Amino acid sequence: MNQYYITECIANENASNIPLHIYTVSLLNLNQKYSFVHHIVYELRKRNANVTIAAHGQYIASFQEIVHWGDHKYIKHEYRAIECSNAAERTVLERLLKQELIERCKNEYKIYKDLFCLKTEQSIEMNEIIVHPAIYLSFTVEENGNILIGFEYQHRFEYKKTLEDLLRDRSPLIKEGVEVVDSYNKKSYYYTFVEVAPYTAGEKSPYLQQSVIDYYITKNETWKLKGVHNKTPIVHVRSQNGDIFPYLPHLLRLTCSYEQLMPSTAQQVNRIIKLPPNEKMPKLYQEIFRLLQYQNMLTFRKENVRAANLNYDIFNLSPPLMEFGRNYKTTKVSDGLGQAGVYEPKSITVSYFVDPELNYDPRKKDEILDFTKKLQHLSEKLGVKLNVSKNRVSYLGYCPFDFFKSERLSFELKSIADAFDGTVIVIGTEENIDRAYMAIKREFGAKADIMTQFVIFDSSVVKNLYYQYNVLLGIYAKSGVQPWILSDEMNSDCFIGLDVSHEHGKHASGIIQVIGKDGRMIKQKSIMTAEAGETIANRTMEEIIDESIFSYEKMYGMKPAHITFHRDGVCREDLDHLTRYMQSFQIPFDFIEIIKRPRRRMAVYTNGRWFTVQGLCYAKERMAYLCATDPRESVGMAQAVKIVQKTKCLSIRDVVSDAYKLSFMHIHSMLKTRLPITVHYADLSSTFHNRGLIHPRSVHEQALPFV
């Protein structure tokens, strides 16, 4: 018999029965309320060494009375349980429970932000990277007082070389704003790098009013001065609160995310961190209950990790039928394309832009010519005729051998952009495409509004039929071809994907619209709006709605009966304003949060074996977890998607069903995505817009320039 599990557990205790000391402090500046109260907490922790303290908003809380306040004052002190209907009080209890656990386990665990690393567990060194296995854990207090913990087995990455090593090597990785970590304490401290200080270790620091060497001698931490002399350089780093600290660079390392790893390193790391369910789940449960033994305020039963014991409604969703050419219907993309071709046959114009480094090699040139002929033949079988432009610049010997490596590539591209027609298929070596990608996307895409599809040419894979299908789907996506639609209708008429991309302090909205019950993409548009933080402004939302309804009416001759908004991440938008604006159209709607990485895993256990099931869903009230994929064991364990319904129009089952069906509309690839394409494409759209890779007034509104 199947048993359904999740990496979540409910405490035996209820928040309404846990008394704590709650102090309310006066806020001098509402705009700085978070930094202000955390400054107070920092001082209180130093004065009350054995008391666990947490804060949120204007609340400071502890399970013990805070006796020593120094110069700080509070305006109210209460000893009571929190009001579970009060979101701020729920948050302060969540933080207090987390801090209590950190304080009690810090002798056995190394704490990295939200990660608990066992000191006894061996870190893994791989190339230039150190990998630290860890447990992520979070506390959630619900409005009914239930206390849940969520957990996940994760890894933390940092560079093997210290900041001192990288500075000595003049590494390009060192630049203002990169994250660094001091791992030489019981708790790791994270900062952003600012600069190399204009003074050395033996000179007086304006921030310390003494030299850094004297500072560590005073603190009785002379072990940190090993190898340090008066002329040792000092760096300035900035804390999360904005304070500047002088630091010895050998005490800092650059942090790293998985996405930043070089492909060769990532492949090696995957063999260690991508654990299949049968390895990950038992290890994860063993480690989390070992960690929870240090939590003395709460108790947990091991059987409360079963979805049924957590009051989840458990159900399975079937893959939807998709329609291809000649009304052929199937649940498999490979079957549909192979048997009947694309849903929407048409002719498209393409141009080839070949890396001159390949073109100057006669054997490679012949292989590429053969490859392009096979692409054209296969595409014709699928129902799409590729009309090849005669303006094949690189074939005519126009570009020099090292053209893709040129320091002036952006400038050189300006003079040849007009020579191409239709979608440009850029064929090159992996190294040269990596080098030229951004320049070509900016000059051809953002400035000339030319669609480009990049193809990495590797003799060992280009003959593979699956590879050729993927290349063609990429070309079709750039050319406005609809390869398949959903045969199974959805519960909503119109879907709008929303995202705000944030990079280097810039924020921009993105949008992809999937209009109609068949999942067809009628129009995509990047909204050229710089947003404040991660909130989409009311005026931007109105523009998005106007564009969507107008496009729907143009296609179907009527307004949609229902609209679903898919928001990438947490909703920070003004839903009251959105409701009023939608009422002016008399269209009901649902606003849905799609949380891509909820740090939960779903698994099924039967006959001594753990496994994942595609289409499995755990739902509760207006929230659900969905397992939308079932990857090969070598790839690791499927990641769940969290779906939160902020409105009450459709049922949560209908909402999840629609999101699952839209994960099959990943039309630029043979692989389905675990996300509905509303959110997946909106994410790509806003990121490309933020990086200046999309034309601000593109005429290609049925193409996907960002895939």
PLM regions and their residue ranges:
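Long, contiguous domain-sized segments
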Residues: 1-187, 380, 384-387, 391-420, ...
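Extended, highly charged clamp/arch subdomains and adjacent linkers
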Residues: 20, 178-457, 699-707
